[in-house]
């Protein structure tokens, strides 16, 4: 009996099993059970390609991360590599939308799903997303394959232009998939993802205005870009609920109902004054969770949770003001790769908090990310530890 149980378990090793949807929107960590091969095999895009001898890795995992601090950055290996992942989606996801989000690949990548080419991403730093819905085999095995070239001298195919910031003497080249990957499953009426690269969508935007620091009040705005992929009109109610750091609901409000036509993209808005606010500040990373939801005929069909803080800033008389107080800016310039020995830039979130928290402990209130955008994890980390971030325009 023991051998039969072991055989049953081994049958499922190597194929990610994604559980049935448990809410109106599901976001799955898509980092586990990838396969990596260093070298170029054009046939690796095919579904039936034999990858059983490839290296098993968990993302984020650049192929050359173990070279970090062992080699000088100008000596980091650059080559072509392939990543593949086998996964299944439950059959009851068939009438849903499925998106994949890569927080970043370096330098250029070709993406395939079930042998079909779905797109090219040439950036090296920023996130990209793809709509997998037309290609998914529900209840069956699916294969995603990604061919990546991290050549130091990589040039855009359309223009023959090099990346301005890709320099052997500066920006450490950890090639492949050095950042997280997520799978999103939504209703066909949904709030878009903030993935302008390829998807051309902007997602949810939460901000505050009319901030009154002394009375701890502000008007909080929520905006969601939504899309209706049903074949009929949808009358949509837009609701917003704000939760404090401890998870307590402090305000609920909603916008006017809107009719969204089939295939139409629209922006829904709502705002309300909130009192008793804690304002985000240096060393005080107070964050709220704002849930924006879509309702049709009294039923919630989509919900997105956004973590954010509220602060008041002003520039005048040669000074910077934060929450109505003058603040002298001082801090560090940090390479966006921000690497650690043996793992490169692909560190867990707690290590990002430790690294960024050290700057706050050292009396810094500002980090200037150098030349290219940092990854999402560092942005969120600085929000948590209370560190102001700056990145110069025109160099990203």
Show where each model-derived region lies.
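Active-site mouth of glycoside hydrolases
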Residues: 125-129, 138, 155, 164, ...
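Short acidic/polar inter-strand loop motif in beta-rich domains
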Residues: 149-156, 295-301, 324
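Signal that preferentially marks extracellular ectodomain short beta-strand elements
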Residues: 130-135, 269-285
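Surface beta-strand/loop "capping" patches
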Residues: 188-230
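Accessory beta-strand-rich segments of carbohydrate-active enzymes
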Residues: 28-30, 40, 78-200, 230, ...
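Beta-strand-rich binding/interaction modules
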Residues: 113, 215-258, 266-268
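Bacterial Sec-dependent N-terminal signal peptides
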Residues: 1-24
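Conserved, mostly hydrophobic/aromatic
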Residues: 34, 115, 181, 224, ...
